[in-house]
């Protein structure tokens, strides 16, 4: 006997991972140079030098490098993370409100489990990372989707209001956004905070913001508002996977706002959820790396150049694209209503694009441009050919 829901998840992979595996298979069959794999948000920019330096130093000097830390993370590491938040954003979180985790996915799963009570509802703002629904349901909650404004892919506040009810525990806010690359402005965050403040009073309990921030440092010439400064009942789920190009190392943290309702006990609930899920003692080596590299920032030049090349090339051809101010994704309007059919036609030209249906945005495809500049240049003729095929069918 086994759990049928888990079987369903295991037997049908996420559309992103499935496309990624398909790309590897195609590369083996026809040559990697003939496959333009834009499926997975896997950073192509190397980790900063400080990461390598820290690893060498730790390997030569730290006798407990591979040992256990405290369940919630090494004290010195949590102190370093807390001080970084205080320096950068002016929020005095303190080490006792920091929980080190195995990346943003673990942070989300722990937080959702900590907040869920009697089939709580969690609002996700479209477009959204598809695994949100998986994580919410695994925590015992129910996902409720709030729509987006089609003009700029920011949250539609009227549908957000309608989505919030008496059982709402939290709203997940992801900015810079995956898949659109949109960065929510200060004005947008203030409006979301206003809605949640009113709804919290209406229903007599706090409605939290879960700030999913793996792309916080990947913003081009715009400011990413720090949500704790706008809304007290905020829990930040952070990952170093994108900012330090460490996706395979699985390291991040949860930070509870000191202004959150019953913050200390909320943190204890997070500790309890981490224990129940087996997410204790995040990878100790990379905890210590983070302590030494906590102030490091990514080199955005490569991503900015990729964005500009891809956005300018596709819009010149005639594609309708959402200009991204952050992350490393370009959201492109499919050339037919059925984005899955469009992505299938793109496949025939070696272009691997993720349909937007799973992101809650039908009629779009996501392009992950965290690839080599050369690959983007070589892919442009394929995008041109794809566009020409649709244009010729109109004649």
Predicted features by range, described:
Residues 70-73, 77:
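Short beta-strand to alpha-helix junction loop
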Residues 38, 64-65, 80-83:
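Glycine-rich loop-to-alpha-helix module at the N-terminal edge of alpha/beta enzyme cores
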Residues 1-19, 26-59, 76, 86-395:
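PLP-dependent class I/II
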Residues 65-68, 274:
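A ubiquitous short alpha-helical element
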């Amino acid at each position: 006997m086994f759990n049928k829901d888990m079987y369903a998840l295991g037997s049908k992979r996420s559309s992103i991972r499935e496309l990624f595996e398909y790309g590897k298979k195609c590369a083996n069959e026809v040559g990697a140079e003939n496959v333009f794999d834009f499926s997975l948000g896997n950073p192509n920019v190397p980790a900063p030098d400080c990461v390598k330096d820290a690893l060498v130093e730790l390997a030569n000097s730290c006798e407990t490098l591979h040992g256990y830390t405290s369940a919630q993370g090494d004290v010195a590491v949590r102190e370093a993370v807390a001080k970084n938040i205080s320096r950068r954003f002016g929020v005095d979180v303190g080490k006792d409100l920091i929980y080190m985790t195995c990346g943003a996915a673990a942070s989300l799963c722990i937080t959702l489990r900590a907040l869920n009570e009697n089939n709580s509802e969690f609002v996700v703002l479209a477009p959204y990372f598809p695994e949100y629904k998986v994580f919410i349901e695994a925590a015992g909650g129910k996902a409720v989707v709030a729509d987006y404004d089609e003009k700029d892919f920011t949250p539609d506040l009227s549908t957000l209001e309608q989505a919030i009810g008496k059982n709402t525990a939290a709203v997940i806010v992801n900015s810079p956004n995956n898949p659109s690359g949109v960065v929510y402005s200060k004005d947008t965050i203030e409006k979301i905070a206003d809605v949640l403040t009113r709804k919290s009073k209406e229903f007599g309990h706090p409605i939290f913001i879960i700030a999913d921030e793996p792309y916080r440092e990947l913003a081009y010439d715009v400011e990413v508002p720090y949500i704790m400064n706008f809304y007290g009942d905020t829990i930040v789920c952070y990952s170093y996977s994108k900012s330090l190009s460490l996706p395979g190392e699985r390291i991040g943290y949860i930070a509870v706002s000191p202004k959150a309702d019953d913050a200390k006990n909320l943190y204890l609930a997070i500790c309890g959820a981490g224990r129940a899920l087996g997410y204790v003692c995040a990878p100790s080596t990379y905890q210590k790396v983070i302590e030494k590299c906590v102030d490091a920032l990514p080199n955005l030049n490569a991503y900015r150049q990729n964005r500009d090349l891809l956005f300018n090339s596709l819009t010149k051809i005639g594609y309708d694209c959402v200009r991204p101010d952050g992350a490393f994704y370009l959201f492109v309007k499919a050339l037919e209503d059925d984005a899955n059919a469009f992505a299938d036609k793109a496949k025939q030209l070696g272009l691997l694009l993720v349909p937007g249906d799973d992101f809650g945005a039908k009629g779009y495809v996501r392009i992950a441009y965290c690839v080599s500049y050369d690959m983007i240049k070589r892919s442009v003729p394929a995008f041109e050919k794809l566009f020409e095929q649709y244009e010729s069918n109109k004649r």
